[in-house]
């Protein structure tokens, strides 16, 4: 089973991209998704084309590491799809997701080069507001897709692509919309192995705990709230 992680902040267009991936490649897919939004919202959009395994208890890179790993192994052993697409929550660290998958990878589970979608309209704001979380997704992706750029001027697309290149010089950053990509580009997404040396996180120093809890806490900014989530 090959595992493809498709990340992106909330609203970046992950579900739309996955549906196009399924349509263009016609492979045997299972999608493992989790969001903090209502249960089954994205799943309902996908189920007509592909099996969806929902994990709604929390972020797969934070609070439900064991459940996430167990779900991946269960999917591999029971459904045995050719490909597992992991759609993590938009507020998670891509480096942590890749690390958790890497821990259970073996000869029957291969991790592919991850894809991250970047909303062209929110790029500047997210990079400023979410800082390490947003940069982590960009720096750990093998392919960076600029989404929602259909009506943006080419100069804006090129400018965002240049900024992305500054954060991740080794990534594939096509400036043409993915719907216009040739068939071989889609097939390459399903065969390109993950570059192990890329994965890292800007958030270091938190303890490796199997369980941690809060009775309550106060935050002043959204970024501070997300940092507390990452410590769970």
What are these regions, as identified by a protein language model?
Residues 2-125:
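Nucleotide-state-sensitive switch-loop elements of NTP-binding domains
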Residues 47-51, 132-134, 190-193:
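Short, hinge-like loop/turn segments at secondary-structure boundaries
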Residues 123, 150-152:
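Short histidine/acidic/glycine/proline-rich micro-motifs that form metal-
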Residues 128-140:
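Flexible active-site lid/hinge loop adjacent to a nucleotide/diphosphate
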Residues 140, 152-232:
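C-terminal accessory "lid"/substrate-recognition subdomains
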């Amino acid at each position: 089973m090959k595992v493809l992680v498709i990340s992106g902040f909330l609203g970046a267009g992950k579900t739309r991209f996955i549906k196009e991936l399924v349509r263009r490649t016609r492979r045997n897919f299972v999608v493992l998704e989790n969001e903090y939004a209502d249960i089954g919202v994205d799943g309902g959009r996908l189920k007509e084309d592909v099996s969806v395994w929902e994990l709604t208890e929390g972020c797969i890179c934070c609070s439900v590491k064991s459940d996430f790993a167990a779900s991946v192994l269960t999917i591999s052993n029971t459904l045995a799809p050719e490909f597992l697409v992991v759609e993590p929550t938009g507020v998670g660290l891509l480096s942590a997701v890749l690390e958790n998958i890497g821990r259970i990878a073996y000869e029957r589970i291969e991790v592919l080069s991850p894809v991250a979608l970047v909303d062209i309209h929110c790029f500047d704001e997210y990079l400023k507001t979410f800082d390490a979380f947003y940069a982590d997704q960009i720096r750990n992706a093998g392919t960076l897709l600029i989404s929602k750029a259909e009506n943006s001027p080419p100069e804006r697309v090129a400018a965002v692509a240049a900024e992305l290149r500054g954060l991740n010089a080794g990534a594939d950053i096509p400036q043409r919309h993915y719907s216009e990509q040739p068939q071989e580009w889609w097939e390459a997404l399903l065969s390109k192995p993950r570059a192990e040396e890329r994965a890292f996180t800007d958030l270091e120093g938190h303890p490796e705990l199997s369980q941690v809890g809060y009775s309550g806490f106060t935050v002043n900014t959204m970024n501070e709230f997300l940092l507390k989530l990452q410590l769970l």
